[in-house]
């Protein structure tokens, strides 16, 4: 496994883990998360793919410029990465906000260069509309109730001034059974994204509505969610229902089915994704 750097046209540089041979698979972690958190999955999937796990701008080992913290810019970063590495066709896997980056990429650049998609636990639309029914709120995975909730979460990110406060912030994304001794590593990786930049990106992503993009996806797709996630399992089933022949896998709450099921039940997660990619 090696770490490579990709120089972007706006002057920033992205860092990525690279390993394996075969068709390229680009992995895009979620908000404040890093490629290092995916090492176990990277190693597993490298048996059948040339895996490139990105640190988005500001995240992990990537450069941290003071500009560009919008989902649209992250989609451009993904596009430039594919172009600069001269990858003719790629599989894409995103987690959380990483899915939104993929949806923005599809919206801007289409699907012709994408082989297969793995979409891991992101809501189609996190911010509600007043006229939506309770079923629609569940189907679209509305995480926020109002703009005040966005402000509160952004303030929570800004309040993460050290490792202890960051541990408290990330704890809510896991099931109660998740080993306490593993949280410091997750928090350390999370904290690599400067908090003022993290809050800026969080605010931009909060109001995205990706339903019309999802409904146009024609790539072979696996959707993964968790019963104990911050996003409803109904929202993951809705995504799968909108994409022809998409597969869906919902992890039960007692089997690590949190927003981070790929950490809590890595063996099952890796096995399911490998099975999908092989077929």
Model-assigned labels for residue ranges:
Residues 254-266, 270:
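Catalytic histidine-centered segment of alpha/beta-hydrolase-like enzymes
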Residues 73-90:
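Conserved acidic catalytic loop of the alpha/beta-hydrolase fold
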Residues 103-108, 113-157:
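Flexible "cap/lid" loop of the alpha/beta hydrolase fold
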Residues 94, 98, 102:
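Gly/Ala-rich beta-loop-alpha elbow adjacent to hydrolase catalytic centers
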Residues 216-257:
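Conserved loop-alpha-helix segment in the C-terminal half of the alpha/beta-hydrolase fold
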Residues 128-129, 133-134, 152-215:
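Conserved alpha/beta-hydrolase catalytic His-Asp/Glu region
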Residues 12-67, 71:
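Conserved HGGG/HGGXW glycine-rich cap/lid loop of the alpha/beta-hydrolase fold
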Residues 1-25, 46-49, 87-88, 115, ...:
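Alpha/beta-hydrolase fold catalytic core
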